[in-house]
């Protein structure tokens, strides 16, 4: 499951509001981020990871 301060807003009440602003949040990181992503940067995705 998601954990830590980065994922906390999405898990709390109003979390869907955070998800709806995904593109706005990505834009805050600056230019060139699409080169570093492993999935489409314009689509919000989530899943359980096993690292």
Swiss-Prot record:
It is an enzyme of class 6 (ligase). Homooctamer. It is found in: Cytoplasm. GO terms for molecular function: ATP binding; glutamine synthetase activity. The keyword Nucleotide-binding applies. Belongs to the glutamine synthetase family. Its main location: cytoplasm. It catalyses: L-glutamate + NH4(+) + ATP = L-glutamine + ADP + phosphate + H(+). One of its GO terms (cellular component) is cytoplasm. Its EC number is 6.3.1.2. Keywords: ATP-binding, Cytoplasm, Ligase, Nitrogen fixation, Nucleotide-binding. It comes from Vitis sp. (Grape). Induction: By E.ampelina infection. This is Glutamine synthetase. The keyword Kinase does not apply.
């Amino acid at each position: 499951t998601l954990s830590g301060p980065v994922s906390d807003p999405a898990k709390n009440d109003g979390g869907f509001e955070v998800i709806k602003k995904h593109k706005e949040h990505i834009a805050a990181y600056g230019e060139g981020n699409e080169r570093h992503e492993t999935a489409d940067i314009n689509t919000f995705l989530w899943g359980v990871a096993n690292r």
